[in-house]
Amino acid sequence: YEITTRLVGSEMCIRDSLEDESKIAFPWSMIDKITPRPHKIVEEQLVKDNIEDMEPIVTSKNTFIAAFVNAERPQYLVVEDKFPNGRPPLEKAGVYMTDRDTVNKTERMKVTTCLNPLHTAMSVYGCMLGYTLICDEMKDADIVALIKRLGYVEGLPVVVNPGILEPKAFIDEVVEQRLPNPFMPDAPQRIATDTSQKVGIRFGETIKSY
């Protein structure tokens, strides 16, 4: 009985602490940085530049571990400014510190309008048309026309504007810089995976808005 009482009391104490926002918090966050798994093209370029030991290790579960990362320059980390015990000056590292509602709106802007719907649409058609790189798809005028219509014509009129990022400028960067980037090789096959599970959130919100 004594042990049970202690266990129950301890659990209730932990629960009460978790519910006390003056002591502990669980800030919302949104991150946007396209980072595919290490690509052979990048590895070959690094080796060509006389950088050694660039060959990735592939685990038994087909996880790639490499000394380099395929990553793009644009990056957005939006965090709810809710730290009851203080925090470092994350703004100095480019982090957007804001309220929970703005974090949520930024996520909705990206996922339902300005990036993910474009990415998914072009990837599905890219797979059907035999493309293996997103940047190569961006040389196809029909695919570019498709994502521009999705973003600018259908998306922008109903976009959720978070206030800290301007939706049109965000799409401009996606279409003009991020997707055409040949130095960040990404496969439409990766993006198109599980598309059936993504349709609702990536296209449904825009449809509902109309």
Regions found by a protein language model. Give the residues of each.
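General secondary-structure edge motif
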Residues: 8, 54, 101, 187-190
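Glycine-rich beta-alpha junction loops
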Residues: 28-34
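Single conserved hydrophobic/aromatic residue that forms the stacking wall/gate
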Residues: 1-9, 13-16
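Domain-level detector for long, ordered catalytic/regulatory cores in large eukaryotic signaling
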Residues: 17-22, 27-28
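Catalytic cofactor-binding cores of redox enzymes
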Residues: 6, 25-26, 118
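A conserved active-site cap/scaffold subdomain adjacent to cofactor or substrate pockets
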Residues: 39-163
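C-terminal catalytic subdomain
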Residues: 125-210
